[in-house]
Design a protein with these regions (language model features):
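C-terminal motif of bacterial Sec signal peptides marking the signal peptidase cleavage site
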Residues: 15-16
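Thiol-based oxidoreductase modules, predominantly thioredoxin-like and allied folds used
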Residues: 79-99
Length: 141
């Protein structure tokens, strides 16, 4: 009887020690959203009534921390978020309310990266600054 129990117990012990299969999450890169990337000058010209314009820099630590969340949102909600790579032509401003209700690119600017505008009918309606505010907005949208 004892010999019969040894075999199943040994099998259970061996199986419990086997390495578990790890499910690896998909890692996205900005190249995965090339079709959703626009230039700063086109930020108010997208053919959509309502969308987010996400301004980022590939060298920005905070941008990289939320990169997976933002790209996933954009891929799941196609056509509702566009990526704007930061460049030296984008004005840096101090007052985050400055871009609100503006309908000309020349009147826009960002406080820093990451930043995100909500654009409705080619007018900036909201300005989100920083990783926490952006992730919160996309999570609640």
């Amino acid at each position: 009887m004892n010999k019969l129990l040894i075999l199943p117990i040994t099998a259970i012990l061996i199986l419990s020690c086997s390495p578990k299969k790890e499910t690896k999450a998909i890692e996205y890169d900005y190249s995965d959203v090339d079709d959703l990337t626009i230039f700063w000058n086109d930020i108010l010209s997208v053919e959509s009534d309502k969308y987010f314009a996400y301004i980022y820099s590939p060298t920005c630590g905070h941008c990289n921390e939320i990169k997976q969340d933002v790209i996933t949102y954009a891929l799941v909600n196609k056509g509702t978020l566009y990526f704007v790579p930061f460049n030296k032509m984008i004005p840096i401003i101090i007052d985050r309310t400055l871009p609100l209700e503006k309908d000309k690119v020349e009147d826009l600017g960002i406080v820093g990266t990451p930043s995100m505008f909500l654009v409705v009918n080619h007018v900036v309606k909201e300005n989100y600054v920083g990783k926490k505010e952006i992730v919160k907005t996309l999570t609640n949208d």
